[in-house]
């Protein structure tokens, strides 16, 4: 894998530091661990910082400081990108460095780069997709195996798909952060999660599942963003009826899917 990375990057990639407050005396990388972020920040040899802490504090301070110091940043921190992305992108642009956050949306589906580059000459009209694998797995178990929500959630936790505290997933918070990131990129207006109507799947019952099946469809948690005629952007996250003919109907288990509707501009 090292040779493959070297070929793609064009230069050798070396991990010089690992920031962690804990001690790892038995780790083969023990010489790389540091507890003071300033060691990384003040080292002129460091050109890229990878943030994997999560949340806003202290991630925001570390990422902002890195960008201001002329270091590119890579992150999968969806909360950080959703709430502070516009500011951090502005700093990165001013400093001539990169702020990469492809992994923050869609479980690694390559959606951010296509929106930013491949579809940049088109007008994005709507995004409506399955953005959270945990809730999609739970709904799949409720549909296929006739499970109640609590039983499906327990199964997801046992398999490692859901956290011990699953609120961010089942309450739609994770999907909300992701659709805000996509909407901000697509429509050029920063969309804040606190302003978005967000409803999770905790109230879905087996009766709801059966009702949808009777009408030839199923329930999916959908993140939706659309450009309105007046120029405003409408965004929401909620369970939705998906007809069996829809592409999204066949997306099950922990998988994500993000259809994008656009207008080709001449």
PLM features: what roles do these ranges have?
Residues 78-99:
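Rossmann-fold NAD(P)-binding glycine/threonine-rich loop
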